[in-house]
Amino acid sequence: MFQDEARFGRMVRIRRCWAPWPARPMVGNGYEREFLYVYGAVSPLQGQFDWMITHIMNTTHMSEFLAQVSSAHRRDFIVMVVDGASSHKAHDLVVPENMRLLRLPPYSPELNPQEHVWDE
C-alpha cells in the first residue's frame, strides 16, 4: 500500500457585511483559517483505499491511521510505502505487527500513486 497525507481547508478574508440602512457597522479586517488533514493509503492492485480525517497532523494520528489500516487488513502482511515526512520517521511512531514501512527516496512524489489521489 502507498500512504500519503493532505491538507484541505479554506482561508477567508472578512471585509464586508450586510446591515440595514443607515447603519454602518465596523468590520474587522482579518483572516479565518480552517483546515482538515486526511491520511490516505491506496492499494492500486487490489483497488482498496483507506482514509482517516483529523484536525491536526502528527505522529500520534499517524500511529492511529496505521492501526486502523492494520485492523482493516488483519489477515494480510502490509508493506506501507511512505514519504519522508517527519511523522513517518519519529521514534514514537507505533507500527503494527502485520506492517512494515518502506520509505521513498527524498523528493520523489512520482513514485507514490497516493499522491495522484489528491489530484482528483
Describe the residue ranges of each PLM region.
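Short functional hotspots at interaction and active-site rims
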Residues: 1-120
